From Swiss-Prot:
Organism lineage string: Eukaryota, Viridiplantae, Streptophyta, Embryophyta, Tracheophyta
Name of the protein described by the UniProt record: Mitogen-activated protein kinase homolog MMK2
Organism: Medicago sativa (Alfalfa)
UniProt-annotated binding residues for ATP: 43-51, 66
Cofactors demanded by this protein: Mg(2+)
The record's note on its domains: The TXY motif contains the threonine and tyrosine residues whose phosphorylation activates the MAP kinases.
Pfam families per UniProt: Pkinase
Phosphotyrosine, modified sites: 197
UniProt cross-references to Gene3D superfamilies, sorted A to Z: Phosphorylase Kinase, domain 1, Transferase(Phosphotransferase) domain 1
SUPFAM superfamilies attached to this UniProt entry: Protein kinase-like (PK-like) (SSF56112)
SMART domains according to UniProt: S_TKc
Amino acid sequence: MSVESAENNIRGVPTHGGRYLQYNIYGNLFEVSRKYVPPIRSVGRGAYGIVCAAVNAETREEVAIKKIGNAFDNRIDAKRTLREIKLLRHMDHENVMSIKDIIRPPQKENFNHVYIVSELMDTDLHQIIRSNQPMTDDHCRYFVYQLLRGLKYVHSANVLHRDLKPSNLLLNANCDLKIGDFGLARTTSETDFMTEYVVTRWYRAPELLLNCSDYTAAIDIWSVGCILGEIVTRQPLFPGRDYVHQLRLVTELIGSPDDASLGFLRSENARRYVRQLPQYPKQNFSARFPNMSPGAVDLLEKMLIFDPSKRIKVDEALCHPYMAPLHDINEEPVCARPFSFDFEEPMFTEEDIKELIWKESVRFNPDPPIN
């Protein structure tokens, strides 16, 4: 017997005594617990693999299932997966993606693929910006407010996202926004530089472009500013071809920093490098963004500041006059306890990480699987 998806005729084949169903989605095999039933459809793919929508037969809600294939082939990818699972399980906020399940593998010894189940969203901000759907100033305010509201919670958990960009901001038809993809997140106290992954350059703060290792939560605020500008102009603010071009685009808009603004750079080489760059005056933001409301322009100027210590903080941004129609301090919760990355031991092997992800799946599914 097979379970069939009416929508596109994707059939589920029972495996492991009927405890699991296997779906073939455009050549990708998905083996999931039997409670995840048709209609099954592909809703996206990325470097990590493929995402499908399915229905949880127990709750009748549609969910997203992300398959991370061969998740333990290298330590960096495996660590990223574990980090995201642990972080999202720790978080509980309307504007942060939540994990509903880690599908427990049928056999621990054959555990190679990780399936993360989360709420299903309709689209992401990148898709909306690139579409021809009209966006008003109210849309812009609502998107940025929710982003800041979620970020306040994330930062209060002692976590930096480090990779905020439109495609990581998930939306549904009501314009509700959730921050996703925490695979690059770090604690605010860590000072390791991002050697593992190439974070999208266009949304990176100047201190990261200049290899500053002791960065702060201000890196995420810079990214919010880039996103705010992109919502209004529907073009990336700083689409740099490389780091040098990226820094030039930044200084062409916000002006070249003076010496006082370079205090955060500990490296004399970095300061010397910035000083020898072509000098640009700051542009008039109102002229540069004629379609942006004055309040949004003012907030943008406070986010796009070269010196991270002078950049507006997330709490201050929520209190900014532009956010006044939505801001309510009592509806902007913080995280009850800080998140700890203690599980990330430097000596961890792929097998150690596999064991920890296995334990996460057992936490969601305590019943032993059929072998």
